[in-house]
């Protein structure tokens, strides 16, 4: 278990050990013999077609759905042996519909679990303010606001803050960004990834979107219909060498292009930038930009070249469409199973 600050656990290893779930009246199990280990501090994305059991698997962790056979452990402790209230208070839970209490202000929504745990009022106030800032909201503007006055993206941020309020070692996120418009969704994804670099929680994240899975996951578990594990690995390894035809079809034919979304401009060999007199009109992007996004910038601008800058805005080099095309060709060849 990873420890940080205040003596609380910040992350926990999660193990699914030959887990099954049978819904009453159904001939086929929803989850069949699922075994995987999620290292402490990583984001594991569960994905698969409809009927793959991804949400069922997630809800067995906090016992919203019972385990029919097998076990799930949190840092070696069986979830089935724990008091269910204690278990759920120690797990952050974020869902698509957010589920904020409409009659409670933002600050009171976030404070719900710390109050149940008996934290001192002063500590709760400090934690609430810290979390409101951490998720990108303004405590002065939003703390005493009711959920009905917030946008969908703001409500999702408050839901995230509430899930983190008691500093749980594990967070369960069931399609948390699925009901938000694409622009806000991308912003929330980026903000959560930056936030995760700070909080380093173990996260189990359910989505139906393979691009979101590739972006968000340290590891991805692809489930077949019937809850059978098809492939569990890093996004890079899944895209490079899918386990079988089902996985290859599921991730899509453009695996090479998807792999470009895993690399930043910082990670590729840049071309020399042209003299300053030849730079006006050239688009630019920071070296932290994904290679796939850099390609989109060039195609959108109609310019085949793009300047690459560091955090201070200094030009470090240049990429071209030809360079990325050659890189794409290389990744596609290596992605052939």
Where would I find each of the regions flagged by the language model?
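ABC ATPase NBD coupling module
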Residues: 78-92, 116
